[in-house]
Amino acid sequence: MLPVASLLILVPLIFAVVTFFTKTKQLAAGFGFLGSLATLGLTLYAYLNFDSSTAAMQFYESVSWIPFLGVNYSVGIDGVSMPLILLNAIVIPFMILFTWKEEMESPNRFYGLILTMQAAVIGVFVALDFVVFYIFWELTLVPLFFIVNLWGGANRAHASYKFFIYTHVASLVMLLGIFGLFYTALNQTGVPTFDIRELIAQFQFFEPGLMKDGIFLAILFGFLAKLPAFPFHSWLPDAYSEAPTAGSILFILLKIGGYGLFRISLPMLPNTGSPQLMIMILGLLGSVSILYGALLALRQKDLKRMIAYSSLSHMGYVILGSAGLVTLSVSGAMFQQFSHGLIMSIMFMSAGAIQTAAGTRIINELGGLAKKMPMLTVAMMVGFMASLGLPGLTGFIAEFLVLTFTFTNLPVFVVIALLAIVVTAGYHLWAMQRAMFGVYNEKLGDVRDINSIQVFSMAVIALLVLYFGLNPSPVLDMMINNSEAIVSLAAGMGV
């Protein structure tokens, strides 16, 4: 069998290197698109050969790297990582197509950084060794920093440095937790290892106390800051709104915070000194993120900042469902990651298209754009309706599972989250009505609809939002067995 996990990292990296040396926009975009298509092909091969009936690791590879430290190049794919790899592989080719006709400086660097970002994110998803995991984790910072800093809006320098410093500091805290995990396990066993699954298994034998809980919280902090969750979200609105359209979508596809929560934090949680307290902390952060993000989204005048705060609100469901520690609540949290990536891609494409066509994304300066941009309006409607949780679309499936199956264990936090539903509907409908319907603002001049390539790109993603909303099983089935394994571990520890 092909070394799929390694190829999923290597292929976009190879195309990234080639793209960096191209001389024209068409060649840069072309090689970028070909690289993303090759990655999609490999992903579909992995998906079609993936066994959804088991929680076991598949496409496993392991090679000794630094033997005296117990570091191995170990990679694999399971039901936690496969949906997120699929999400990235699907969206990025259409994101590149969407930007095909955009004028930009240094397109070779732009598309090369996109492919580098894709390789780094997939590297995080397949890594089974903490050293490999952390290398790819940190690598994701570099392309995002430069994409915002070089091709972003007027405040791009502030936004890019704020994002880099904030998330890098959080990553260093996480690294301290990883080292604490490694050294404590080494003292107990005498055998060095950075294997993620082995260290999580060893964690249960650590002496209860401040050190043990400190290790857990340090690692968790790194994930929550990257997700992000309230109150670690201050980098998000500036970074999302100042990034170019492709950069905003790459931020949305950066699901490594939620992934780390499922892969590492939840399996460790039952073995902390105070698991019930940790669950309450997660439940509180999740529910507050949902409501707080929705309230801030309602206040925004800038369409892109509204979408950014909406993203914060939606990520709250990932945390809340995780805290529910029921198979279907955790599965709903995982599905929310997948759904959110599709939905927010449409929404940021919509905001980018409006800014390009109308010269502004201030909601009160728009109006009646549906008359001039009917194709965009249809795609945007799908994204906005899915984001507010309309039945039949992916957003409904995820939020329904999280709220329904978390209620038994954490009813108060679910009630807090339910308060946000009305607010969420309000800001989505208000923004659509003000921007796309009503009287056309003649000051906008002769606004043109999105081009045929952009229509195609948005239509494919919108159809996937509809398809997986009506038939979530092709993705959800992969998640359920792994969710059940996490929940069974918690039940075995009496949580």
Curated annotation (Swiss-Prot):
Compartment list: Cell membrane
An example Gene Ontology molecular-function term: NADH dehydrogenase (ubiquinone) activity
> What is the main EC category here?
oxidoreductase
A Gene Ontology biological process in which this protein takes part is:
ATP synthesis coupled electron transport
Query: What does the record give as the reaction this protein catalyses?
Result: methanophenazine + reduced coenzyme F420-(gamma-L-Glu)(n) = dihydromethanophenazine + oxidized coenzyme F420-(gamma-L-Glu)(n) + H(+)
A Gene Ontology CC term for this entry? plasma membrane
Q: What is this protein called?
A: F(420)H(2) dehydrogenase subunit M
Species of provenance: Methanosarcina mazei (strain ATCC BAA-159 / DSM 3647 / Goe1 / Go1 / JCM 11833 / OCM 88)
Q: Which gene encodes it?
A: fpoM
